[in-house]
Amino acid sequence: MSQSSDPSPRLVESPLLLQSSDLFCNLDIPQLERIRHPDSLTPSPNSVPPSPMLPIPVSVPNGDWESREELRLRELEEARARAAQMEKTMRWWSDCTANWREKWSKVRAERNKAREEGAQLRSRLEILSKELGALKRERQEAATETEQLRKELERLQGKARVLVSNDHDIEEPVRDVEIEKLTKNKDSDLDNSVRLECWEIQNGGPSRSPRPRNWEDVSPSEDDTTKITALKLRLDESQKVLLKEREDKMLLNKTIEKMEAEISQWKMKCEELNKSRQEAVKQLTLLRERHQDELGRISEDLQDELGVRSSMDKKLAELRAEMEGLQAENAEEWGRRERLETEKLNLERENKKLRLQIQDLEEILTRKRRQSASALDTDLKSIQAELFEKNKELSDLRHSHSKLKKQYHERSSEFSHANRRVEQLESEVKKLRLRVEELKKELGQAEDELDEAQNQIRKLQRTLDEQTELNENLQVQLEHVQSRLRRQQNPPLFGKLRASRFSNDDAVDLGSDPDEDDLQIQVP
C-alpha cells in the first residue's frame, strides 16, 4: 500500500506538473524545467512571478485584445468551476472517511468488550471446575464416613440385642413370651430413637413426636454409650457436610444457568456483529463504485484541463510571436538600435553562460540523485538560490533597460496595459495549477485512506471469526461440564444407609414419616 505522502502515478505522469511559466520563457531556456524532480509536487523556483517585460511601442487594434481577453476570462471561469467541483468531491471524501472511522471505532470497542468477557468466562469456568473437583472429593469422603458410621451402628445394635437376650435367659421361663415381646419393643424403640435423633440433627430442632428413652431400660455398658455419643457427633458432622454440599451444588446450578444465559447473549451479539459486518461490506462496495465513478470524472476533467492548457500555451506562443514581429518592425524606427543590440548580445552571452551552468548543474544533480536524496534537496536549494540571484540580476538589467526607453512610454502605454493583463491572467493560472496539484495530493491521500480502511475491515473480520470460534469452544466446554455433572448423579446416600441399616419391619414403620425425604441428597 502506498504511503499518503507519495503521489499516485497518474498525478506524477500528468503534464500539468511538468509545465510552468518562468522568467526564462522569453529567453528560450527549456532545460530549466528538467531541474524539478518528477516525483516532487512542491512548486519550483520557476514559479516566481516574472519581471515586467520590456515595453515596446506597438500599435494593436483594440478589438482583437478585447476578444482575446474575453476568451481568457471564460477559460479562467471554467477552470475555477472545475476547481470548485474538485473541492466538493474532496469534502465528500473527507466526510465519508470520518463516518467510516467512527464505525471502525465502534466495532473495535465491541471487539475489545467481547475479548474481555470471553476472558472472564474462561476464568469463571476454571474456578467452577476447581470447585467441582473439591466437591467431588468432599462427597467421596462423606460417603466413606457414612459407610463407617453404618457399620458401627450395626455392630452396636448387635451388642445391644445380645445383652437383651442374656437378660431374658436369667428370668423365669414362664414369662418368656412377654420378655420376647418386650425385647422386640425395646429393639424397635432403640432403632426408632436413633433414627429420630438423626432426623433431629438434620432438621436442626426436635422431632414431632417425643423421643423415647429406652436406653436406660436396655442398660448398655459405658463403652457402648461413649461410642454411641461419638457416633452421634460424627453423624452431626456428616449431616452438616452433606447440607453444605447440597447448598454448593445449588449455587453451581445457578452459576451454570447464568453462564448459559450469558452465552445466549453472546450468540446474539455475534449475530449482530455479523449483520453489521455484512452491512459494512455492502457500503464498501458502494463506496468503491462511487470512487471509480469519481476517478473517471476527475480523469475526464484533467484531460479537459490539459486541452485548455495546451490551447492557452498555443495562444501565448502566438502572442509571443506577434510581439517578436512587432519588435522587428519597430526596431527600424529607433536610432539607438545598435546600443540596444550590444546590450542584447551581452544578455545573450550571459544567458548562454547560464544555460551551460544549468546543464552542468543538471549533470551534478543526476549524479547526486543517485547517491542520496538528502544531498539532492540541498543542491536544489542552492541552485534555486543561484537562479533567484540571476533572476534578480536580469530584473535589474531590464530595469536599467526600461530607464533608457522612457521616451517610448507614450506610444506603448496600451501595449504595456495588455501585457499587465496577460501577467495577471498567468498568475491566476498558476494559482489554479497549484490548487489542482493540492487537490491531486488530497485525492491520493483519500485513496490511501480507503486502502487502509479495507485492510482494517479485513483485520476486524478475522478477529470476529476468531471470537466466534472462541465462543463456540466455550459453549462446548460448558456442555461437557454439564454432561459430567449429569453422569456423576448417584442415588441418595441416606436411602442406601436406611435400606442396609434397618430391617423390613422398621422400614414399614418409617414409611409414613414425612421427614424422611429431607435426608436424601438432591443432585440435579
UniProtKB/Swiss-Prot annotation:
Amino acid composition bias (Pro residues), ranges on this chain: 46-55
A GO CC term attached to the entry: myosin complex
UniProt-annotated stretches for the region Disordered: 36-63, 201-223, 504-524
Disulphide bonds in the chain: none
Keyword list, A-Z: Coiled coil
Protein name, per record: Coiled-coil domain-containing protein 102A
Coiled-coil residue spans: 68-167, 242-490
KW Thylakoid (keyword) present: no
Record bears the keyword Hydrolase: no
Acidic residues bias: start-end ranges: 506-524
Pfam family, one: Myosin_tail_1
Domain of life: Eukaryota
Listed Gene3D superfamilies: 1.10.287.1490, 1.20.5.340
